[in-house]
C-alpha cells in the first residue's frame, strides 16, 4: 500500500485518512482528532504511511492500544526504502521512542513478528548513536516468547570432538557463490577448518560451492522458526559444539531468534551485516582492525583481526574480463553509485548535491540500484531527482551481468 501511494501523485494516503479526522479544521495536520473506537484506530494505522504529513502522538496511541501501536512502529521501520525526509524522520523518532515501550511487550503473539528482522536490520541505516537499542528490546521480547513456548537452552558443558578437533557450528542466512556473504566470509571459514571441525547449517539454497566450505553440511529442517531452532539445537547437541558462529545476522528470523539462545559455550558473530546484536548470548564479534571506528558501537567483545585477515573472493557471477575505458578531459564526469535502496538517505543525497554544486566540471550521477523495481522504482527515482534533477539517472534493479 505504501509503495502504491508513494509512487503516485498522492505520495501518501492522508486524503483518505481525513475521512476519520474529527477536527472541523482539516487543514491542520498537527491537530488530527481520531475517535477511540478500535476499528478506527486499526484503519488509521493501516493507512498511516511513512510519507504521511500527519503528526501522531505515539504516547496517546500506546495508552489506547500498546500492541497496535507496536505493530504500527514495526510497519514504519520495515520498508527497504526509507530515505525521504518524512520517512527517515519517522523511523528516527521511533528508534528513540520505541525501545523502552517494546521491552514491555510480553511476547510476539500480537505484533507482526514476521517482519521482526526488518526492525532488527534496518535500524542500522539511521544516524543516531543509539540507533541499535531497539535490538536489545526486541531481543528481550523474543527471549520471553521462546521461554513461554517451552524453549530450553542446550547443556553446553557437554562438548565433543570430530577428527580430533573441537566443533564449530555455523548458522547461515544467505550463503551461495553469488551472494555477498560467500564472497566476504567463505575463505576465513575454510581456513578455520585447520583448527575446527566445521558444520554448516542453512537452507536448501546453499549451493555446492557454499556447502564445500564445510566439513559437514545440514539443511535446516522445520516449518517455522521454533522448529528450526529445535533442529539447530539437536545438531549442536549431537556434535558437542564448542563454538556457535553466525557470519551474518539480521537477514533472517532464524538467526535473530538463535542469537537469543544458548547453543554453545562460545557464541560469535561476524560483520556479514555490519552491526552489533545487543544480545546477552553473543560474546564476541569478529572484525578486521581497520573496520573498527569505535568499540562503543558494539555490545560484544571485539576479536580484532589484522587488516585483510578475512580476504574476499569474487562473485560467481562476476565477469571474467572488464574493459576499462578512460576518457581524458570529458565534458561530463560520470559518477557511478552502486547501492541497494535501504542505503540511501537524505544526508547522502545532500552531500551529492553539494558535490555537484561545488564541482568545477559538470558531473552526472548514475545510480545502479538494487531492490528498486516495479512500483518502488518511481518512488526511488523521484527522491533522487528531488536533489539532483537531471544530473542523475536512476537505473532499476537488474540481473547481475547487466548491472
Give the residues covered by each predicted segment:
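Conserved active-site histidine-acidic residue motif and adjacent donor-binding/catalytic loop
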Residues: 223-231, 392-403
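Conserved catalytic-core segment of nucleotide-activated headgroup transferases in glycan assembly
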Residues: 176-197, 307-400
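Alpha-helical solenoid repeat scaffolds of the TPR/TPR-like class and their adjacent stem/linker regions
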Residues: 1-331
Amino acid at each position: 500500500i505504501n509503495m502504491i501511494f508513494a509512487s503516485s501523485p498522492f505520495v501518501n494516503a492522508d486524503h483518505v485518512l481525513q475521512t476519520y479526522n474529527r477536527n472541523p479544521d482539516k487543514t491542520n495536520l498537527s491537530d488530527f482528532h481520531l475517535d477511540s473506537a478500535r476499528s478506527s484506530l486499526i484503519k488509521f494505522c493501516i493507512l498511516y504511511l511513512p510519507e504521511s504529513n500527519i503528526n501522531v502522538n505515539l504516547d496517546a496511541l500506546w495508552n489506547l492500544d500498546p500492541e497496535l501501536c507496536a505493530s504500527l512502529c514495526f510497519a514504519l521501520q520495515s520498508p527497504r526504502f526509507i530515505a525521504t525526509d518524512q520517512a527517515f524522520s519517522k523511523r528516527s523518532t521511533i528508534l528513540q521512542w520505541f525501545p523502552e515501550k517494546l521491552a514491555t511487550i510480553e511476547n510476539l503473539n500480537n505484533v507482526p513478528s514476521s517482519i521482526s528482522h526488518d526492525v532488527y536490520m534496518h535500524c542500522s541505516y539511521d544516524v543516531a548513536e543509539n540507533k541499535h537499542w531497539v535490538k536489545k528490546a526486541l531481543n528481550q521480547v523474543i527471549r520471553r516468547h521462546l521461554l513461554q513456548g517451552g524453549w530450553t537452552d542446550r547443556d553446553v558443558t557437554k562438548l565433543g570432538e570430530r577428527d580430533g578437533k573441537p566443533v564449530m557450528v555455523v548458522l547461515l542466512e544467505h550463503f551461495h557463490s553469488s551472494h555477498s556473504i560467500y564472497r566476504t566470509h567463505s575463505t576465513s571459514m575454510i581456513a578455520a577448518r585447520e583448527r575446527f571441525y566445521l558444520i554448516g547449517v542453512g537452507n536448501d539454497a546453499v549451493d555446492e560451492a557454499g556447502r564445500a566450505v564445510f566439513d559437514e553440511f545440514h539443511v535446516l529442517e522445520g516449518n517455522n522458526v521454533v522448529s528450526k531452532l529445535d533442529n539447530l539445537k539437536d545438531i549442536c547437541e549431537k556434535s558437542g559444539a564448542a563454538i556457535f558462529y553466525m557470519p551474518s545476522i539480521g537477514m533472517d528470523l532464524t538467526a535473530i531468534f538463535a542469537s537469543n539462545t544458548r547453543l554453545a559455550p562460545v557464541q560469535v558473530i561476524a560483520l556479514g551485516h555490519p552491526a552489533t546484536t545487543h544480545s546477552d548470548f553473543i560474546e564476541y564479534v569478529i572484525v578486521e582492525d581497520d573496520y573498527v571506528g569505535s568499540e562503543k558501537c558494539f555490545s560484544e567483545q571485539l576479536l580484532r583481526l589484522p587488516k585483510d585477515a578475512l580476504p574476499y573472493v569474487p562473485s560467481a557471477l562476476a565477469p571474467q574480463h572488464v574493459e576499462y575505458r578512460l576518457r581524458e578531459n570529458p565534458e561530463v564526469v560520470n559518477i557511478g553509485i552502486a547501492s541497494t535502496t535501504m542505503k540511501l538517505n537524505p544526508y547522502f543525497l545532500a552531500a551529492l548535491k553539494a558535490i555537484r554544486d561545488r564541482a568545477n566540471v559538470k558531473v552526472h550521477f548514475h545510480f545502479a540500484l538494487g531492490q528498486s523495481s516495479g512500483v518502488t522504482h518511481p518512488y526511488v527515482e523521484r527522491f533522487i531527482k528531488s536533489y539532483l534533477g537531471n544530473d542523475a539517472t536512476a537505473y532499476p534493479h537488474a540481473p547481475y551481468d547487466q548491472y
